[in-house]
C-alpha cells in the first residue's frame, strides 16, 4: 500500500509579497535575517504556517472532507545545495518553515532529503508512504508544467501512478489580483493506496485576510 491522499501547497509568503513592498524575511527565532532574508518567510508567511494547523488538524480541521490530517510531511532541503542542482539560486528555507508549526503539532518529522529541483524523486518517496501526505514546495514546480516547460510535481504524480486523466489540474500555478497565489491546496486522491489517481480537487485555504474563495 502507498499514499492514499497527496496534498501539495506552495510555501507561505516570501519577501515581496506585500503588493510589491519589500520586507525582509524572518527566521524561526523572529530575527530579521539580513542578507539571508530572501530565503525565509515574511511575518505574514509565518501567520499562514501557523494557520495551516487549523486547516489540517482536529479539533479545527480537516476543514473539508477533501483534506486529511497528514501522516507524512515533505519539503525541499532547506540547507544543502545538491551536487547536480544546476539552479543559480541556493536552497530556500521557506517550504520547510511553512510546515514547522504543523510538524510540531503532529509531532512528526519533515522529510527534507530532496533538493528543490529533485521533486521527481521526492514524489517517488511520497507515493511510497502509507497514508496521507502533505508536500510544501516552490510554486513554479507544483502544477502540471514548470516555468521551464518540463513536467511539474502534479505531472510526476500522474505519471508515476500510471494516471492518464488530467482532472482539470492547472497547467501553471494559479494567480490572483496580487500575483501567484499562496492560499491553495492541490489534492490528489488514491483511496486504495495503489494504482492511478482517482480524483483531484483544487481547494482554497481561506485562512488569512485577503485569501480568495
Residue ranges of predicted features:
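Active-site-proximal alpha-helix that buttresses catalytic centers in soluble enzyme cores
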Residues: 2-130, 141-213
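Mobile, glycine-rich extracellular loop/lid and propeptide segments
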Residues: 133
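Short beta-strand segments
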Residues: 136-138
